[in-house]
Regions:
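Conserved nucleic-acid-binding Ia/Ib motif block in the N-terminal RecA-like helicase ATPase lobe
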Residues: 121-193, 265, 389
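Conserved interdomain linker/interface between the two RecA-like ATPase lobes of SF2 helicase motors
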Residues: 249-341, 388
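Conserved motor-coupling elements within RecA-like helicase/translocase cores
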Residues: 173-188, 396-412
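A short beta-strand element within the Helicase C-terminal
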Residues: 413, 420-437
């Protein structure tokens, strides 16, 4: 039947379920299904922005695309055509990094000669030549995690290489010398690190003074423990704008936020010009969500066995249909335990062959050699049966190997922790999140996952 009303989590947060939600009761578990949201209808004025119609600066940077996607096309006139502050709240996979790239190109265009629009007559086959005043500006991109920072650096560095623009990471792991900072135009950093840089009144004033654009990715984390740091950064930037009459553009990117109006006010966004909110109807790939609750007291061996069984039933059904599945767990040691439990269930049920990689692909020698070299015994054992694990405690080389095996289809089921979700885009048809409580070391207790996680 349908479900109405609000539900309280055990921590007092209210949740409401969307219309059309169905609930099914089984002997040992119950399941709530949230249907796919209907795609948002197209507005009659909506036209995709074609790359060939852009000026040479954008055209050459977005060269491998033919057009911007739906959300990017709607936001393009504001992102690239104005200096308005922006808050973009959109579903995952909406191409927010490219919207940020449009605002970066807007900043670069202001320090380019000749001006990009003066070269619009250039035919599309000719590579434009720009001289960029490299030392005149800095662009700061604040990413929530180091893993994401590395991914953003790689993307922007390769896209903007043709202009000679340097993009570097400045995080707890990656320090930059003064000379490197001076030679870099785009600095990708974490909230905590940028807080340290801007906090020192006598510190890097040259660096801070040259900032023309501040992009805050995953700004919905304002709600989490680290929100205060992000809040401080933004307030400090706004104070700098007022005190020095300098022009710094603020761009916030987030998942679909409930309180987007508050966040946009805080960012100083003009709600009629710079506020863009897209709901789940704009997801490029529709998402159907199933919440499965297992009976019994959470954390007891009996409940855990039941959880593994229900998890296996799901995974086996998906793999039998030819799909790859990622199973997220909340502790490193659980990755191995869950993978082994799923494999054991498959052996008992006689379905293990469905999980094994196809014979013809199992002989990729280059990868086989790398697997043989790995010291991770548990990982190697599981790989034979098409299972694998991924968590931050593994060696970088092993993690990269697992990612490659999964993207080539040689691993059917990957048990991993959330570090994988933050920084790596792997092509899974379905994602299973096993258990909804994580250990919070600051509270010294298990807490519910936030719905954004």
């Amino acid at each position: 039947g349908g479900l109405g009303g609000n539900m309280l989590s055990m921590f007092g947060s209210k949740y409401a379920l969307p219309m059309g939600t169905a609930r099914d009761e089984f002997a040992d578990h119950e399941e709530i299904t949230i249907p796919i949201s209907t795609p948002a209808p197209r507005h009659y004025t909506e036209e995709p922005v074609l790359i060939e119609d852009m000026d040479p600066l954008c055209r050459y940077t977005f060269g491998k695309y033919t057009s911007l996607n739906r959300i990017q096309s709607i936001i393009y006139p504001t992102a690239y055509g104005t200096n308005e502050n922006i808050l973009l709240s959109a579903p995952t996979g909406a191409g927010k990094t490219d919207v940020a790239l449009l605002t970066i190109l807007r900043t670069i265009a202001q320090f380019c000669s000749p001006a990009p629009r003066d070269l619009e007559w250039l035919d599309t086959s000719t590579k434009p030549k720009f001289t960029v005043a490299m030392s005149e500006f800095k662009i700061i991109y604040v990413a929530p995690m180091k893993a994401l920072a590395a991914e953003v650096v790689e993307k922007y560095q390769s896209r903007l290489k043709w202009l000679g623009i340097q993009c570097r990471e400045l995080t707890g792991d990656m320090q930059l010398t003064k000379a490197e900072v001076n030679a870099t135009q785009i600095i990708v950093t974490t909230p905590e690190k940028w807080d340290v840089v801007t906090r020192k009144s006598s510190g890097d004033t040259e660096l801070v003074d040259r900032v023309k654009l501040l992009i805050v990715d995953e700004i919905h984390l304002l709600n989490e423990d680290r929100g205060s740091v992000i809040e401080t950064l933004i307030a400090r930037t706004q104070r700098q704008v007022e005190a020095r009459q300098s022009m710094i553009r603020l761009v916030g990117l987030s998942a679909t936020l409930p309180n987007y109006v508050d966040v946009s006010n805080f960012l100083g966004v003009n709600p009629y010009k710079g506020l863009f909110y897209f709901d789940a109807g704009y997801r490029p790939v529709p998402l159907e969500q199933h919440f499965v609750g297992v009976h019994g007291k959470a954390g007891t061996p009996a409940a855990n066995r039941l959880l593994n069984r229900v998890c296996y039933d799901r995974v086996q059904r998906l793999v039998a249909e030819g799909n790859q599945v990622m199973v997220f767990v909340h502790a490193r040691k659980d990755t191995v335990k869950t993978a082994q439990a799923l494999r054991d269930h498959a052996m008992t049920d006689g379905t293990l062959d469905q999980f094994k990689p196809p014979e013809d692909t199992a002989t990729d020698l280059r990868l086989t050699g790398r697997v043989a070299k790995s010291q991770n015994r548990e990982m190697k054992e599981l790989l034979n049966d098409g299972f694998s694990i991924h968590h931050a405690g593994m060696l970088r080389s092993d993690r990269n190997l697992v990612e490659e095996l999964f993207s080539k289809g040689l691993v059917r089921v990957l048990c991993c922790t959330s570090t994988l979700a933050w920084g790596v885009n792997l092509p899974a048809y379905a994602v299973v999140i096993k258990g909804t409580q994580v250990y919070d070391s600051q509270k010294g207790a298990f807490v519910d996952l936030s719905i954004l996680d």
